[in-house]
Amino acid sequence: MGAARIAPSLALLLCCPVLSSAYALVDADDVFTKEEQIFLLHRAQAQCDKLLKEVLHTAANIMESDKGWTPASTSGKPRKEKASGKFYPESKENKDVPTGSRRRGRPCLPEWDNIVCWPLGAPGEVVAVPCPDYIYDFNHKGHAYRRCDRNGSWEVVPGHNRTWANYSECLKFMTNETREREVFDRLGMIYTVGYSMSLASLTVAVLILAYFRRLHCTRNYIHMHMFLSFMLRAASIFVKDAVLYSGFTLDEAERLTEEELHIIAQVPPPPAAAAVGYAGCRVAVTFFLYFLATNYYWILVEGLYLHSLIFMAFFSEKKYLWGFTIFGWGLPAVFVAVWVGVRATLANTGCWDLSSGHKKWIIQVPILASVVLNFILFINIIRVLATKLRETNAGRCDTRQQYRKLLRSTLVLVPLFGVHYTVFMALPYTEVSGTLWQIQMHYEMLFNSFQGFFVAIIYCFCNGEVQAEIRKSWSRWTLALDFKRKARSGSSSYSYGPMVSHTSVTNVGPRAGLSLPLSPRLPPATTNGHSQLPGHAKPGAPATETETLPVTMAVPKDDGFLNGSCSGLDEEASGSARPPPLLQEEWETVM
């Protein structure tokens, strides 16, 4: 038994949901607007009008003959009519009508009621059709019902001049019983707080890494690019929500009734000239998709970089940094531009939402490929970590300690590789009810929105090198502030940790004619008595590679790349390879 045996079990546990239904990963952020719904309704109406012409022609031939109308069966399930090649939902038997009156008679003519294309109805029977899938928030497993009376007319609502229809099964997802308002309010709060905290923490992290010159190295450059992608993703989500807030929201869906669906369906489709009004939401959706894709690809770049450091003995970091930059920002721009071109030419309607046909795969396939590839890299790195732990700690620690080290390293890598995406990916997004659905949505909203915050905490604020630079900068600032305050009060007393130095102007005789000189023309020992103290550097002067602190911080070795120094990691522009001993030191830092 060894720590290396955890890796195969972990791979088997996490790989299945990734390969089974990874496609649901991107659809979680999809937005369905009212304009898109109107477009789908009018497209369904056009298809129904074409079908009605053929069916009415067939019905006229039937009524001209003396054969009457006899339904094929009463099973209530759709079947395919061989004669015309069209689908005709079969009728459900109405037990209130005598059997003899249902055998022959004039059928109810098919028609479009602004929601469903109703087929021919057998006299005296209830016609059931599946809830249309082009109504986004319908329960697509239910049915809508109409009744055809014995005279061959659709039954009307008593006292109203409209046809009776029952859409209760289709509307069950829109009731307050299944879509509880407090659940969605809580999810919205998690969503907003998470992305806000991620945006704020990532902004601070980028400023820290950019400010300190000693933190400038390839590893931190890649971190900064990934942080920036998280920031742009969060900002684009807020902008997209603000632009599309007037769309087909959950509040509207809860209040939606059959009559309102008829009103929506009767709105004429917008003319081509009105497409200019969609420019704002289309730009918002396009930038959201681009920054979403770049975020996934910079997560993949982090995985590729770490994988290359471990498995490549000669790895030119500066040389590959440009390639990583083009890969992370340029490749998503290519397939997003292709998607924009396809939408603009083939489906230039509404706000260019992803849910329009199979065109969404132009963006989803590259993103899902990056997720699967990053997951494979994660499993391989965990496998190597387990092997190295078993080899380096053989005979020095027990198995439980090895497991704890492996678990700690794994948890550090989880937010970097986005492994949390795989937990609920096998569950469909259509089941908008139940305890399991609520657990899934709370989990995904929490980790998706807070992922940037976790990454900033682990890879910047908990980085020992970053903490050391902040302490040095704080000590220099407080020392300079204390020196200025003492100088204004007539004393040059200052302190540096436990060390105290004091030079007073009263120690100089009045006959000497001297005052406390603060000019840099004096020797360093006189003008700046603390210049030889540990860690001192002139304000504004760049740090040198030879500058070291006499007292170093104890950094745990198994914190991985969190506390690795930037010194010595980057190579010269000539692309000289790192010697094998340095690679071994880097590997020991990982462990």
From Swiss-Prot:
Primary localization: membrane
Glycosylation sites: N151, N161, N166, N176
Biased composition (Basic and acidic residues): 81-96
Extracellular side: 27-188, 240-282, 343-361, 429-440
Spans traversing the lipid bilayer: 189-212, 220-239, 283-306, 321-342, 362-382, 410-428, 441-463
Signal peptide (residue range): 1-26
Motif Important for interaction with G proteins: positions: 474-477
BP term (GO), one: cell population proliferation
Job description of the protein: G-protein-coupled receptor for parathyroid hormone (PTH) and for parathyroid hormone-related peptide (PTHLH). Ligand binding causes a conformation change that triggers signaling via guanine nucleotide-binding proteins (G proteins) and modulates the activity of downstream effectors, such as adenylate cyclase (cAMP). PTH1R is coupled to G(s) G alpha proteins and mediates activation of adenylate cyclase activity. PTHLH dissociates from PTH1R more rapidly than PTH; as consequence, the cAMP response induced by PTHLH decays faster than the response induced by PTH.
Family the entry assigns: Belongs to the G-protein coupled receptor 2 family.
Protein name: Parathyroid hormone/parathyroid hormone-related peptide receptor
Species: Rattus norvegicus
